Amino acid sequence: LGVFVDEALDFLDSHGLPLEAVAVSCGPGSYTGLRIGVSMAKGICYGRGVKLIAVPTLELMAVPVLLGEHPEEEDALIVPMLDARRMEVYAEVLDRALKVVRPIQADIVDADTYKEYLDQHHVYFFGNGAAKCMETINHPNAHLVEGIEPLAKNMAPLAEKRFVEGKFEDVAYFVPFYLKDFVAKMPKKLL
C-alpha cells in the first residue's frame, strides 16, 4: 500500500496536480485493515496539510447497487452486509437516496431480523455477509445482489459530495468505526 500511495503522490507532484483532501473508508471492517488505511490517510493529510474525508464502508458498497439494475421499486430498501463470522453481520438499512433507515449495527441474523422492512418493502441484500443470510431470511421480498464488495473506486462520488459539503474529519483525533471492541486471542499454534 505504501509503495502505491508513494507512486500516486509522485504522479500528482510531477504533473503539478493539487491534492486537497484524502478519503478513507472509516469502517466497519477488519481491525487491521482499518488501522492501516486510516493511519496512512492521516499521515498523508498531516504531512501535506490537506483535509481528511471519512466514508462509511457500508455506504460505499451501496454505490454499485444504485448504479446497477437494482433496486427497481421506488420504495425499495438496500442492506449492505459485511460478514462478522457465524450468523452475524454488520449491516445498515438505507433507502434509494442513501438515507439511513436503520443505523449500522451488528445483527445476529434469524428469520425475523429484517421482517419489519420485508413486510412493507422489497429489500436488496448484498456484500460478503448477505449470501449466508438469505436462506435464513427466506422472504418473498428479499433479494440477493451478488458480486458487491467494498471497492475504493466506489468511494469517489461519496467523497466528492462530502468535500463539497465541507464534511471533514479532525486529522489528529479521527479514529475508525470498529463497531465492536477488538478481542485479542492466543494463537492456536505457538512458535
Regions found by a protein language model. Name each.
Residues 1-5, 41, 152-156:
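A general structural signal for well-ordered alpha-helical segments in protein cores
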Residues 145-191:
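Acyltransferase
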Residues 51-150, 178, 183-184, 188:
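Surface "functional belts" at beta-alpha junctions
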Residues 1-28:
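N-terminal beta-alpha supersecondary unit
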Residues 8-12, 47, 65, 152-163:
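Stable alpha-helical structural segments in soluble proteins, enriched in small hydrophobic residues
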Residues 23-57:
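DPxDG-like acidic metal-binding loop motif
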Residues 14-18, 72-74, 169:
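Short helix-terminating capping/connector loops at secondary-structure junctions
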